[in-house]
A protein has these predicted regions:
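Short connector loops/turns at beta-strand edges and beta->alpha or beta->beta junctions
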Residues: 50-55, 366-369, 443
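Extracytoplasmic Gram-positive cell-surface binding/anchoring modules and repeats
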Residues: 420-465
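Single, functionally critical "micro-switch" positions that shape active/binding sites
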Residues: 122, 283, 441
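Acidic, metal/ion-coordinating pockets
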Residues: 1-170, 214, 219-229, 237-240, ...
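Extracellular/luminal Pro/Thr/Ser-rich low-complexity repeat and linker "mucin-like" segments
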Residues: 44, 89, 184, 188, ...
């Protein structure tokens, strides 16, 4: 959060640049730009730009008082004017190139403000030496997967070339840094390296496609089951019947896979590294439906807010258009739904979903405070934090409920979230359930948005189904 950021800033012995994040007094909390002059006299101007998505990608409760300027064009043009005497101007952006981040991507920045010579980008973890249409945008991925190189000609004072160099196991490392890192690794291994369980199945840690940000996963099922189980151990504190208690966590918070074999505490903390605590919020069925609609607005494209669930069965009509409000949610880059077009809640704990009923949603404190697309949760007037972290809940669930073994029940997603890509198939129609079930079982596929056919020659069993 902001408090931690301020503390870190006092320890930094280097420039941190960001032109579009302001404090309560309306002034940038960082230096906006900086000019570096090389030994050969080339003046390189840098300015920083943070994604406005940080308003909901970070826990909103931890960044109160900060304002994120969404007018990338105006901010960039101001910086270009300040750096107009420099030979080369480079934007250091944390914007990314994902479609779900529009209109705040590095493409949007480059196209909006003329005069940027190069963009060094982050946020989407993309690996690219140039943009899709040749834009001078470079991104090195994540976790030091690559080193980006830019070559500037001293004579012309222009960028001559740029490239990426992949870091491999045999790449030479700085000895002092490697030694310092190893001390930290050894300390973590000592504290969290003990085996506490085994897994008979691999739990999906991918983002997309076919990952935690664009569909149901067995990892999401396990985590939300654990969250729900943990709260139900002390259900006396709940104000609704247990058949009205569900769990939701954002797929973007699931960061790694669990392999077959021994499972350590370190493995679980790698899957859930943020230290989020479990909160319980009370919402109406209408508010729950809004949260699901908003958090799947771009699916089948990936989105960090994708709702992994327990106790809920829902269908996403991916062929339907998201009916967005004209204005974004407060302090957000996301648009809430004007109407519900894409999501249908099929059941809650096997029973009929009722829009006017009150439901207890077990979620993480990030979503409860309105992180990602969950403004409907932030608006809840009744909520409480259990103080239990997600990783501890998962470890307790595996140890006590699963008896230390993640078994075949988690070999595959359990069919809680269904996809309906057909524009002319409504969940409420007499044939809707049958078509959607056949599609999600892999028996049929769409040949267009309105027609379908078997994927292969059908067996009698498949045909009769």
């Amino acid at each position: 959060g902001y408090a931690q950021l301020k503390e870190n800033m006092t320890k930094a012995d280097f420039k941190v640049l960001c032109a579009n994040v302001y404090g309560e007094d309306g002034t940038p909390i960082f230096d906006a730009n900086y000019t570096y002059t090389t030994k050969s006299g080339v003046k390189i101007g840098f300015f920083g730009m943070e994604t406005p998505e940080a308003q909901t990608k970070a826990n909103p409760a931890l960044i109160k008082g900060l304002k994120f300027d969404t007018d990338l064009k105006a901010v960039a043009e101001k910086q270009l004017e300040a750096l107009k005497d420099d030979d080369v101007v480079i934007a250091l952006s944390h914007l990314g190139v994902d479609d779900s981040s529009k209109p705040y991507t590095s493409y949007d920045l480059y196209n909006a403000a003329k005069g940027i010579d190069f963009i060094i980008d982050g946020h989407s973890h993309s690996v690219m030496a140039k943009g899709k249409n040749g834009e001078p945008i470079q991104s090195t991925g994540t976790k030091f997967a690559n080193i980006g190189v830019i070559v500037i000609d001293n004579a012309t004072k222009k960028i001559e070339s740029n490239s990426l160099y992949e870091i491999k196991e045999d790449t030479a490392k700085d000895a002092a840094v490697a030694a310092a890192a190893q001390k930290i690794i050894d300390r973590i291994d000592k504290e969290y390296g003990a085996v506490f369980a085994k897994s008979k199945v691999e739990l999906n840690g991918a983002k997309a496609p076919n990952g935690n940000r664009d569909g149901e996963t067995n990892n999401g099922d396990l985590i939300t089951d654990a969250m729900l189980w943990k709260v139900m151990q002390n259900k006396e504190g709940l104000t609704v019947n247990e058949d009205h208690v569900v769990a939701i966590t954002n797929g973007g918070g699931i960061r790694a896979a669990i392999k077959v074999g021994d499972v350590t505490k370190k493995d679980i903390k790698t899957v859930l590294p943020f230290g989020n605590t479990i909160e319980v919020i009370y919402v109406t069925g209408t508010e729950l439906l809004e949260a699901l609609e908003a958090s799947t607005f771009c699916v089948p494209e990936s989105i960090g807010g994708f709702p992994q669930v327990s106790g809920i069965s829902y269908t996403i009509s991916t062929g339907a258009v998201y009916d967005a409000n004209a204005e974004t949610y407060p302090a957000s880059t996301y648009y809430g739904p004007k109407s519900i077009n894409r999501v249908t809640i099929n059941s809650i704990n096997g029973k009929e979903f009722k829009a006017n009923d009150t439901y207890a949603v077990v979620t993480n404190n990030f979503c409860a405070e309105g992180g990602d697309t969950y403004y409907a949760f932030a608006a809840a007037t009744s909520k409480f934090d259990t103080g239990v972290t997600l990783d501890m809940a998962v470890m307790d669930y595996i140890t006590k409920e699963l008896k230390g073994v993640i078994g075949e029940q988690y070999a595959a997603p359990q069919g809680r979230i269904l996809m309906n890509p057909f524009k002319d198939v409504k969940v409420s129609s007499w044939f809707g359930k049958y078509v959607i079930d056949l599609y999600n079982d892999g028996i049929i596929n769409g040949t267009s948005a309105t027609t379908y056919a078997p994927n292969d020659t059908l067996t009698w069993a498949a045909a009769l189904k």
